Amino acid sequence: MSKYDSHLKCSFCGKSQEQVRKLIAGPGVYICDECVELCNEILDEELMEAPTSPVASSVSSREDRPKRRSSRDRLSLGQIPKPREIKKYLDEYVIGQNEAKKVLSVAVYNHYKRLSDIQAKRTGTGATDDPVELQKSNILLMGPTGSGKTLLAQTLAKILDVPFAVADATTLTEAGYVGEDVENILLRLLQVADLDVEEAQRGIIYIDEIDKIARKSENPSITRDVSGEGVQQALLKMLEGTVANVPPQGGRKHPYQDCIQIDTSNILFICGGAFVGLDKIVEQRLGKKSMGFIRPAEGTSKEKWSADLLKQLEPDDLVKFGMIPEFVGRIPVMASLDPLDEDALIAILTQPRNALVKQYQKLLKMDNVQLEFKSEAVRAIAQEAYRRKTGARALRGIVEELMLEVMYELPSRKDVKRCLITREMVEKRSTADLLMHPSSIPTPESA
């Protein structure tokens, strides 16, 4: 070292070169032999505690968990849930949307039958010489925000005996760019299946916000659309059926990484999105066919008119919206969800098994307080949610604002045994009177 090196220190422990045996230089930093030895000891300890590979680690950890019955053990036709049974279960959690429920129920039932047919041919219990192969029919759900698309998918996951994963299309980008590869969608399904590849290959994937990957213009651009058309291109083979290489730890793939191969031929894909503006494209097409403008019937709301237009959707309309023709062709089944009116929002507040009113009643019951909503208060909440135009999502925000002071004060008060929410309290967003005079509240007709 030169004479200028006398003040060099380790960038990690701060010891000078005179205090250590060796000081190793890097680009702008230095590390001493003691820090190198300490790092080696830490790495050795971690390697001794952890299995040798990420996949082995995941496998060993899932062996300690209760095992879920494999779909391979129960795919006889007698055990497959019927479409009516699936829809009945969805009715317990989701209000309305009967057409979408029927589409999903039939699709899931047929998915089970496809798996049963494949299993029968492999085991020799079915007609091995039958040349007919059952092809899957991927599904597209369209509807305004807050209409229940994601909730339908989440509710399906509770009843199904096959792995079910939910993914978000907005996080996906074309390979080689910042963001998630499309293979990460399969990783989620693989994790739900406890890294059982054969079980994951029988699963169902729901891709939310699929309309957000529409290309930015109808005509191809000279600039790359890495989060739009690029993602659609990457999803094509996965939707149709291909053997994909999935990195076990997620993230980007690299040449020196061990990947898990998954065949997507038997994975059912359900895509959902709001598709804002698609109704205008349908309206324009229908207007041209009728040699003029088409108008909604008198008394029809704008939301209901948009939903009626989506029921007349054709594949070309989706292409004009920004979905490439190859992508549209791989999702043959389409269903639109109806917008939620005031009556539907009231039902959502009170009727489902996980209704918001029931949730907050349970929360206050844990503090030994009975919570009651007057029927007019429930209607006022629904009216405010309808005004916000965000569907059922607005309900929780409104009720949370309304209940904030109640939930803040009640745990500290032992004199309150019952709380009543009235329409006036909803409109003024105030619960002060309720908290100050709990004993003077008369017994009302509650919702």
From Swiss-Prot:
All copies of domain ClpX-type ZB, residue ranges: 1-51
One protein family per Pfam: zf-C4_ClpX
Any Gene Ontology biological process: cell division
Top-level taxon: Bacteria
Keywords: ATP-binding, Chaperone, Metal-binding, Nucleotide-binding, Zinc
Annotated segments matching region Disordered: 50-77
Family of the protein in this entry: Belongs to the ClpX chaperone family.
Functional summary from the UniProt entry: ATP-dependent specificity component of the Clp protease. It directs the protease to specific substrates. Can perform chaperone functions in the absence of ClpP.
Assembly and interaction partners: Component of the ClpX-ClpP complex. Forms a hexameric ring that, in the presence of ATP, binds to fourteen ClpP subunits assembled into a disk-like structure with a central cavity, resembling the structure of eukaryotic proteasomes.
The protein's name in its UniProt record: ATP-dependent Clp protease ATP-binding subunit ClpX
Organism of origin: Gloeothece citriformis (strain PCC 7424)
Lineage of the organism: Bacteria, Bacillati, Cyanobacteriota, Cyanophyceae, Oscillatoriophycideae
Underlying gene: clpX
